[in-house]
Amino acid sequence: MKKPLRWLAALTALLLPLSAFAQQQGLTIDIVGGSASATPITVVPMPYQGSGTAPQTDVSAVVSADLDRSGQFRTLPAAQIVEKPTRGTEVQFQTWRTLKQNYIVVGRVMDAGEGAYRVEYELFDVAKGERLLGLAMTARANAMRDVSHQMADAIYEKVTGVRGAFWTRIAYVTASGSGGSMRYALMVADSDGYNPQTIVRSAEPLLSPNWSPDGKKLAYVSFERGNSSIYLQDIASGARELVSSFRGINGAPSFSPDGRRLALALSRSGNPEIYVMDLGSKQLTQLTNHFGIDTEPTWAPDGGSIYFTSDRGGRPQIYQVAASGGSANRVTFQGNYNATASVSFDGKKVAVAQGSGNTYRIAMMDRSLGSPSWSTLSPGSLDESPSFAPNASMVLYAAREGGRGVLYAVSADARVRQRLVLADGDVREPAWGPYRTAH
């Protein structure tokens, strides 16, 4: 049986019933795969050297897990760390050269007063014996995972030249119950699945979460009014605003890069078309006008155009139209089903759900060298909803395994996949948030 169009099914709320699952638990993380060509790095355990109570967060373990799941690094297993220096002056570089390590990270955790901790760490090039980073960060106990992610970001950027995206958040939807007793929740968590936070609970479907560029708000679709409606919700305060509840479909909201506009799919004129709403005035501009179904808009990074899914050519493909309207150009030509586009920060890569027969996988079109080249990122048969990390190093997507929904984060070179799954639940509709700013 052919899979129904994911993007049309979502807009019309034709959701498959789920088994009874709990939605209050955090996500369980499993890292799948690895690569022999990943850069070897040792993150030495960082002991607590204070006089009080040690933080519950194992800083070095979080940093190691971040680097491992990026696909760019291969950390040395703890059992093979034969020496445990905490300062650069204690590092015996020949030991780590013998272990064929390219880099080593050492550090320690100390008291900073008033219940806070200070983490000092250093990154070294093993071959050269050269210190590349020497930094200190201070945080309270409940922010030690944030500090660990920021450390991993700094290490990642120093070695690769690309800004790290570990200290970011993801949004997703969980579901529980069955039939008429379904319950949904819109959740936000750290990029590795920790620290889940419930944003919205509903007895009706929740779909298509989309982050504002400052990471402070989420746009999403709710059916609580009986019909699809689009809301904006402030994550910190919980305040929300109904911005679209026209007759028919109100779906697939997407914030513009400047946060002032919202692209959306509306059928207010009878057929699903792409519109742009000015969030200040609430004025609508219709961008497409075609007998085909146009949906799933997503902005180009420069804000000058919008990608969207359309079946105007007979089958779902990705098209692009100027943000001011006009004629649309087809973007994808490989395969007879390409939908749900996510565009990298530089506009050079487009991730899609690509279908062939009854198999749907995440594929990526790379235009870095001019002519498009394609790669398959996921091995599943029912994979959908790709979402790039803000640095495009990883792609988050939804999959189904054993009749339940799970999430995967895959490195952009497909070397490593990280599975995020509710211990007793179903999860879907992922969206990777923007970079965070330290306050």
Swiss-Prot record:
Keywords: Cell cycle, Cell division, Periplasm, Signal
Membership in a protein family: Belongs to the TolB family.
Protein known as: Tol-Pal system protein TolB
One Gene Ontology cellular component: periplasmic space
Signal peptide, first to last residue: 1-22
Pfam family, one: TolB_N
Subunit record text: The Tol-Pal system is composed of five core proteins: the inner membrane proteins TolA, TolQ and TolR, the periplasmic protein TolB and the outer membrane protein Pal. They form a network linking the inner and outer membranes and the peptidoglycan layer.
UniProt subcellular location: Periplasm
Organism name: Xanthomonas campestris pv. campestris (strain ATCC 33913 / DSM 3586 / NCPPB 528 / LMG 568 / P 25)
Entry's Gene Ontology BP terms: cell division; protein import
Summary of the function given for this chain in its UniProt record: Part of the Tol-Pal system, which plays a role in outer membrane invagination during cell division and is important for maintaining outer membrane integrity.
Gene of this entry: tolB
